[in-house]
A protein has these predicted regions:
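C-terminal active-site-proximal or functional interface alpha/beta core segments in diverse enzymes
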Residues: 187-219
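Active-site-proximal beta-alpha core segment in soluble small-molecule metabolic enzymes
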Residues: 47-186
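A structural motif corresponding to the C-terminal end of an alpha-helix
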Residues: 37-42, 168-173, 205-218
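Generic N-terminal amphipathic, Lys/Arg-enriched alpha-helix
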Residues: 3-22
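Expand to "…catalyze enediolate/carbanion chemistry for C-C bond making/breaking, isomerization
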Residues: 14-15, 28, 98-100
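N-terminal glycine-rich anion-binding loops that anchor highly charged ligand groups
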Residues: 2-7, 26-56
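Residue-level preference for long, well-ordered alpha-helices that form the structural scaffold
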Residues: 16, 23, 116, 155, ...
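A non-catalytic, amphipathic alpha-helix used as a structural packing/dimerization or gating element
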Residues: 25-33, 161, 198, 202-205
Length: 219
């Protein structure tokens, strides 16, 4: 049990607000507990929107967490600035200026794995066009809708058509699949595992999604 009583802000009036103030030992404890829950830090791709803090991202990196999910381009930059070797912008982009900025970030960190989620042919089109104009290759992940109904292609011909569109674009590389099952709130691990397995089984029925090119293997 971590005691909270010893924590006091020595000079409250000297603290400029708003500011994020945390119990550092609790943050460290929670990061370690999360790694234990999933069998090791290497099995995690953590979402930075819960803290939006480069300092906490560095703590996560220090224990071996390598993958980071981001909701905004600024979060993506933050994770990469902290040293993340792999990061995905989990919300698809359609605005050209955002895609241009994503391309800039990808070019700056071309020694990392930086992905954009795509869930619709329009996302593929704008990314492919801008990447081609810049003579640049951009990495993407196919965003799949497994029941949240917020973003992503359906687990049917939508997904296979999207996957085919990516392969048809010379300036894009498909780095894998992205799924968010936020509609499921099972507390029981066995129920969570069963739901996840159903999604895996559904994916196996989609022809073409398991055909990985040599470029994709090396991304």
């Amino acid at each position: 049990m971590i005691e909270q009583d010893p924590y006091r802000i020595a000079d409250p009036d000297g603290l400029e607000t708003p500011a994020m103030v945390v119990f550092e030992e609790m943050v460290d404890h929670n990061i370690a507990a999360l790694c234990d829950m999933v069998g090791g830090a290497a099995n995690l791709m953590v979402h930075v929107k819960t803290h939006k803090s480069e300092a906490i991202a560095r703590k996560q990196l220090a224990v071996g967490i390598a993958g980071f999910k981001c909701a905004t381009l600024r979060e993506l930059e933050m994770a990469l600035e902290a040293g993340a070797p792999e990061a995905i912008l989990a919300y698809p982009m359609v605005q050209r200026r955002k895609v241009e900025r994503f391309a800039d970030i990808s070019a700056t960190y071309d020694d990392r794995k930086v992905y954009a989620a795509v869930g619709d042919p329009r996302h593929v089109d704008v990314l492919a066009q801008i990447a081609q104009n810049r003579s640049q290759k951009l990495a993407v992940m196919v965003d799949l809708d497994v029941g949240m109904h917020r973003t992503g292609a359906g687990l049917d011909e939508e997904a296979t058509a999207l996957y085919s569109a990516i392969h048809a674009a010379p300036s894009l590389i498909c780095g894998g699949l992205h799924v968010y099952d936020g509609h499921e709130h099972f507390r029981d691990p066995s129920a969570r595992n069963a739901a996840a397995q159903r999604h895996v089984d559904d994916l196996k029925t989609l022809k073409g999604l398991n055909e990985i090119t040599e470029d994709e293997k090396s991304i």
